[in-house]
Every structure is written in C-alpha cells, then in structure tokens.
C-alpha cells in the first residue's frame, strides 16, 4: 500500500510539474521575445551602449530571434531528466542535442531558459568579450542557504564587486605558478603517504598488486593535499585509522555530492512546494552545515595558534591561511566561506582527474612508457620532484591536459550575458543564461584529430614560440573567472603522477574492463577503476 500511495503522490506531482513548467516556459518565451524586440530596436537605431556584437561567419544578414532557435521542448527535457535519469547522462544528452539541433540551441529546464553553445570559436568569443566580473549561471540555492544561515559567499558563489574583491586577494597567493611552488614540500609529504597506502592496500589482495576503486584512495589523497595548503595542517586521511573529525567532514562532502540529483530536482521545484517535499532542501542545508563547521574549526584553530605566537613575542610563520588572517584582507566570515568552497571544489575534481589519468595510462602502456622514459632521463628514478622540475617533463603536463580533454571534470560551464549579444546569427538579450558545452567540444573531430584517442603528444609545443591553445578544451576555464585553484590542482596531480610512475608500472586489472563516465554534478567514473601497481625493477 505504501508504494501505491507514493505512486499516486508522484503522479499528482508530475501533473503539477507539467502545468507549472508549461506556464513558466510560455512566460519565459514571451519575456525572451520582448528582450529580443527591444534589442533589435536598439540595434536598428545604432544606440546600443556597451554592447558586444560577435558576428558569426555565414550568419544571416540580420539577427534572428530566440524563438527561431532550435532546441528540445520543455516536455522532452522533463521526460529526459526526470523519467530517464538524464542527470547522470548530461554529457551524452549534450552531444545528442548538438547532433540534432546544431552547435547553438535553446532549452527550457523548469523555470530556467538556457542557450547552449558547443562551438569552439563561439566559446572563445564569449569568454574574450567578458567584463571585469563575469556572471556565472544561477546558483540561487547556494545563495539562499547563505542568507538563511547568515553566511558569506565565497569565490564560487559570489558575484559582482564582492567576487572581484575576494578574487584580487586570493589570486595573489595561489594563482601564479611561483606562488604555489612553496607548497610542493607539503604536497610531496602527502604523496609519500599515498605511495605507502598503495603498498598497504595491494598487500591485502591475492595478487599483491591490485588496488580496487582507486578513486576512493585519490579522494583521500586530494583532501589531505589541499588541506595542507588551505588549513596548513594534516587531516590524517591516509592513515589506517582516520580521525573522527575528518570522517565527519568526508561524510558531509559525500552527502553533498550524493544528493546532486535531488538538489537538481529541488532546483526545478518552486519554494512553495518545499513543505510537501522537504527532504532535498533539508539535506542540502545539512551538508553545507557540516562543510562550514569543518572549515570554521580549522580556521579558528589556526587563529588561536597565531595569537599564542604573538602573545609570546614570537615571529608568526605560515602559508596561505596565516597570510590572510594576519593581513585581515578578508573578514572572518569571508574566510570561512572561501576555505569551505575551495576545499569543496578541490577534492573530487582532483581525485576524479587522477583516477582517469591512472586508468588511461594503464590502458595505454606505450604512452605510459614514453612518460616514464622522460622522467628517468630528466629526473631519475629516485629523485623526489619539486615544482621547478615539472617544466622539464612536458609529457606529464600533456597527460593531464589530455586526461581533462577526454574527461573534463565539468562537462559544461555557465555564464549570464552582461550585454545584448549577437552570436551564431541570433540576438541573445542581456541576462540570458549560457551553457558552454565543454564535453562536446572536447570530442569534436574538427578541433581534435582522432578525438576519441588518448594522445598526450597533441599538447606538446614543437618550438619555443609554438603555443598550443585550443578553446575546444578549457577545463579550468579562461580569463578572470578561470579556476582560482588551477595551479594548486596541477601541482597535486603532477607531483603525484611523477612519483607513481617512478615507483610503479600501472597496469589494467582483470576486475576492470571499460569504464564509462557519468555525470554526478561532476563527470566521474560510472564504475570502480581497479588497477595493478607493479613495482619497478
């Protein structure tokens, strides 16, 4: 009887959602048409102040309106995402829509209207034309939580002048390559613990070589490594007995990612329906509470240590957190928010990328051998690498770039137009949400020959002036709103890959065949990646 009751409620919900979405879609079409007419009138009059017009080769003589733009219907999106588990196949749906509608198309998703772009040159034009503070796509639920709890926004959730002010503080400390070099020693200590952990885990297997589900291992490595930089402390993630406080944070982090799908459902449900469907929002808030609590404990702990040093008349030494606390360039609430959001952004993104890189190297032994040979030739088998050593190993950097091309952590990125925009022959009004389809451009044969293949060599420079730049694959974004943690992530992955290859030959395991990606907020492995770490002779 319970399942029958649930089914009846679900059917009623579906009917309500359909009616709601149909109403909202109609209203949005009307609003977008109104915006187009106003924009067209301003264009005709030649008085569009500050507009960035991006003509597309081969476009029609005059801009077309958004009603003429192709795209899936609201009902089709509803069916695809809510009935066919489309949230786990966003990357596939992206490609299907491009094949059907072309490289620019529109979509209605609940109350949101989105124009999707899957053209490398259009993406480049959009990003190069951005102002000083580009606006990302709607993150209303994040803002609502912060308003509810009296929390500040951080770099991921903030917009406008506040975002720009925080960005200017943090970019001076972690965005330039030379700024992150000082963290290499701490990261190498974590890599050493990672190697020890691999040896422990494989010793428990019958063959003495296999590590099952390497992403679980890399998750702990990533969390430990980024915490040494953000919090200036060790968390014990790679110990046999993980501390309780760290386990509680891991639980909150896993809850945040495990409920991605329900959060997406909640985003399409109006606030007035929350009393009837409270669980998604309650769990969303609970996970954020845990993440903020963890950051606050570590920030406050470091603040007490600094004060104790000052009370003793001692010189205060430290890294990123210490520098910000002493300079007071951010308020304490802003610091809590940024540490929380940067840790959230820096764990799964790094662990998934390391998992895919390990998988690709195991599946491509010839490419792996070339990388290893370059390491031995330029560094040796036993030398612990520094950040300064990485430029000597262009293949290591190319492996990371090629891994992120094949498996971009974010299959798409969002922007909101800050001016009326002519793109692909269409007039897109100010305030329109854009989805930049990075997964699809990464696999476009026009931009990458043999796009399905793992070919790190495509990223190598053939001369000192030959810069390999391709907007078909920009996993860290571009311009002022590019990933603030790019250099930190690269450092963690480069140093880990170098030392993994110095110690082990990475081979496929009979337990793992082909692993496909799925979308779970981020692009992640749909199944466990099991590999063999064989000792180097």
Curated annotation (Swiss-Prot):
Heme binds at residue 483. Its cofactor is heme. The keyword Signal does not apply. GO terms for cellular component: mitochondrial inner membrane. Gene3D superfamilies: Cytochrome P450. Its main location: membrane. It is found in: Membrane. One of its GO terms (molecular function) is monooxygenase activity. It catalyses: all-trans-retinol + 2 reduced [adrenodoxin] + O2 + 2 H(+) = all-trans-3,4-didehydroretinol + 2 oxidized [adrenodoxin] + 2 H2O. The keyword Oxidoreductase applies. Expressed in the dorsal third of retinal pigment epithelium, but not in the ventral counterpart (at protein level). Its EC number is 1.14.19.53. GO terms for biological process: C21-steroid hormone biosynthetic process; cellular response to peptide hormone stimulus; cholesterol metabolic process; cortisol metabolic process; glucocorticoid biosynthetic process. Keywords: Heme, Iron, Lipid metabolism, Membrane, Metal-binding, Monooxygenase, Oxidoreductase. Transmembrane segments: none annotated. Efficiently catalyzes the conversion of all-trans retinol (also called vitamin A1, the precursor of 11-cis retinal) to 3,4-didehydroretinol (also called vitamin A2, the precursor of 11-cis 3,4-didehydroretinal), also acts on all-trans retinal and all-trans retinoic acid. The replacement of 11-cis retinal chromophore in photopigments with 11-cis 3,4-didehydroretinal enhances sensitivity to long-wavelength light. This may improve vision in fresh water which is often turbid. Belongs to the cytochrome P450 family. This is Cytochrome P450 27C1.
């Amino acid at each position: 009887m319970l399942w029958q009751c649930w089914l009846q409620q679900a059917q009623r919900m579906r009917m309500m959602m359909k009616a709601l979405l149909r109403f909202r879609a109609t209203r949005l079409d009307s609003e977008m048409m109104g915006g187009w007419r106003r924009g067209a009138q301003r264009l005709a009059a030649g008085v569009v102040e500050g507009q960035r017009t991006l003509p597309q080769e081969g476009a029609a003589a005059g801009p077309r309106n958004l009603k003429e733009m192709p795209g899936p219907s609201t009902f089709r999106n509803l069916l695809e995402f809510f009935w066919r588990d489309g949230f786990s196949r966003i990357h596939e749906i992206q490609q299907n829509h491009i094949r059907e509608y072309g490289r620019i198309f529109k979509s209605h998703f609940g109350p949101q209207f989105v124009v999707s772009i899957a053209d490398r040159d259009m993406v480049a034009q959009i990003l190069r034309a951005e102002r000083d503070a580009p606006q990302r796509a709607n993150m209303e639920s994040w803002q609502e939580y912060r308003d509810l709890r009296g929390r500040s926004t951080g770099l991921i959730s903030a917009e406008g002048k506040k975002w720009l002010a925080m960005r200017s503080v943090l970019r001076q400390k972690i965005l330039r390559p030379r700024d992150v070099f000082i963290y290499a020693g701490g990261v190498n200590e974590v890599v050493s613990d990672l190697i020890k952990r691999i040896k422990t885990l494989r010793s428990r297997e019958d063959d003495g070589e296999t590590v099952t589900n390497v992403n679980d291992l890399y998750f702990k490595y990533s969390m430990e490594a980024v915490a040494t930089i953000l919090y200036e402390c060790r968390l014990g993630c790679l110990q046999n007995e993980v501390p309780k406080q760290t386990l509680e944070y891991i639980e909150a982090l896993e809850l945040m990612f495990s409920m991605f799908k329900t959060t997406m459902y909640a985003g399409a449900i109006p606030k007035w329906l929350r009393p009837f469907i409270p669980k998604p929002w309650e769990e969303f808030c609970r996970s954020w509470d845990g993440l903020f609590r963890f950051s606050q404990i570590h920030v406050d702990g470091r603040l007490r240590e600094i004060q104790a040093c000052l009370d003793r008349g001692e010189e205060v030494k430290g890294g990123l957190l210490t520098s910000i606390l002493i300079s007071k360039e951010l308020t304490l609430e802003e610091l809590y928010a940024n540490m929380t959001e940067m840790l959230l952004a820096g764990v799964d993104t790094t662990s998934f990328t390391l998992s895919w890189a390990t998988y690709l190297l195991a599946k491509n032994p010839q490419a792996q051998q070339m990388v290893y040979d370059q390491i031995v030739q330029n560094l040796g088998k036993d030398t612990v690498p520094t950040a300064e050593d990485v430029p000597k190993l262009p293949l290591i950097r190319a492996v990371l770039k090629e891994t992120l091309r094949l498996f971009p952590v974010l299959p798409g990125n969002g922007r909101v137009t800050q001016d009326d925009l002519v793109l692909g022959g269409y007039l897109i009004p100010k305030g329109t949400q854009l989805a930049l389809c990075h997964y699809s451009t990464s696999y476009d044969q026009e931009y990458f020959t043999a796009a399905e293949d793992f070919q790190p060599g495509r990223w190598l420079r053939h001369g000192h002036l030959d810069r390999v730049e391709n907007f078909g694959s920009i996993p860290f974004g571009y311009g002022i709103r590019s990933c603030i943690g790019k250099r930190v992530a690269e450092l963690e992955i480069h140093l880990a890959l170098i030392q993994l290859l110095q110690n082990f030959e990475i081979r496929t395991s009979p337990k793992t065949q082909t692993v496909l990606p799925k979308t779970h907020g981020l692009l992640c492995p749909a199944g466990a990646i099991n590999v063999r770490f064989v000792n180097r002779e």
